[in-house]
């Protein structure tokens, strides 16, 4: 299968291993698009892409730019959209309902969502949505033999509106527990910091799915204290409470379970080990890339014929 994979050149997360994981399992032409190229997809395709050469054209671009160009995107054959932010469709933020509105203009496109329940909800709306979770960079994030001298911590951003629930929970927890909240550079510093943390607090409040940090912390051997996203999401990922992760729904429950783990270091060590084994076997970008290619394979829904205006604009390149 010949795949054109269009990704963002300027992206905070380092996802090169994910793209390599996809390329391992298909004939993949990966292109890194600048912000300017993403803003003018019609021009980019006119200059750089022969759509007849590809069995699948996969977008992993900024949603903000996609929604402004749905008229052109409708004309692209064999379209698949890889989307890690579709949970924002269902939470109070500037993109509430916007993903549904966008996909209604592209009803034949396959959407690969990183949330199990999100993909279910999209399917209920009539879209062809499939689930492949987020993962972690197996080359960058590995366990080290350093001392875990930070007992309880969160590493990452709390700034955006989508993270307002995260910030509120972490602020509340910091009032009653010795929580460290910090940020690091990507890469070695991030890996080293995760390897110093015994209990990693994941606070994906109100998001309905697990963000990438959960898998990164598990891979580095932290005990993951995860805000519970519900039975369906947990089952889809193989997450089991006090077996490979520790779930909580509020601060009192988190404190109760934390006290149990402090009193039983062997239980904590077992959970960390089981979580790490699950992450390594199921959530490395090598494995996630393979899963993405698997869901690219089935035939796509037939695309509606182009209108006369769409055909004319394609021919004229305007």
What are these regions (language model features)?
Residues 1-54, 59-74, 78-237, 317:
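Nucleotide-sugar donor-binding catalytic core of glycosyltransferases
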Residues 5, 18, 22, 154, ...:
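Ligand-binding pocket scaffold of soluble enzyme catalytic domains
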Residues 101-102, 191, 251, 265, ...:
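Non-membrane alpha-helical structural segments and their capping/turn regions in soluble enzymes
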Residues 243-251, 260-265:
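Conserved acidic donor-binding segment of nucleotide-sugar-dependent glycosyltransferases
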Residues 258-261, 265-318:
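C-terminal amphipathic helix plus adjacent low-complexity
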């Amino acid at each position: 299968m010949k795949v054109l994979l269009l990704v963002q050149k300027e992206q905070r997360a380092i996802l090169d291993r994910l793209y390599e994981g996809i390329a391992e399992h298909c004939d993949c032409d990966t292109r890194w698009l600048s912000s300017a190229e993403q803003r003018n997809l019609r021009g980019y395709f006119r200059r750089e892409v022969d759509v007849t050469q590809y069995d699948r054209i996969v977008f992993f671009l900024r949603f903000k730019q996609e929604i402004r160009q749905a008229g052109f995107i409708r004309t692209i054959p064999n379209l698949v959209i890889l989307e890690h932010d579709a949970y924002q469709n269902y939470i109070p933020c500037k993109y509430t309902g916007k993903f549904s509105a966008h996909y209604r203009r592209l009803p034949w496109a396959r959407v690969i969502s990183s949330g199990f329940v999100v993909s279910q909800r999209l399917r209920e709306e009539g879209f062809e949505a499939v689930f492949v979770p987020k993962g972690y960079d197996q080359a960058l994030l590995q366990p080290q033999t350093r001392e875990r001298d930070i007992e309880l911590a969160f590493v990452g951003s709390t700034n955006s509106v989508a993270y307002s629930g995260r910030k509120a929970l972490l602020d509340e927890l910091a009032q009653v527990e010795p929580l460290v909240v910090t940020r690091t550079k990507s890469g070695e510093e991030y890996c080293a910091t995760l390897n110093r943390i015994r209990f990693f607090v994941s606070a994906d409040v109100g998001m309905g799915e697990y963000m990438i940090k959960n898998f990164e912390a598990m891979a580095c051997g932290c005990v993951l204290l995860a805000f519970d996203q519900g039975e369906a999401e947990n089952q889809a990922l193989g997450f089991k409470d006090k077996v490979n992760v520790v779930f909580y729904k509020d601060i009192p429950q988190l404190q109760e379970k934390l006290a149990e783990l402090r009193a039983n270091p062997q239980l904590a060590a077992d959970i960390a080990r089981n979580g790490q084994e699950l992450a390594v076997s199921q959530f490395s970008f090598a494995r996630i890339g393979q899963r993405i290619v698997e869901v690219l394979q089935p035939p796509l829904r037939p695309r509606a014929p182009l209108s006369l205006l769409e055909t004319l604009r394609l021919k004229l390149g305007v």
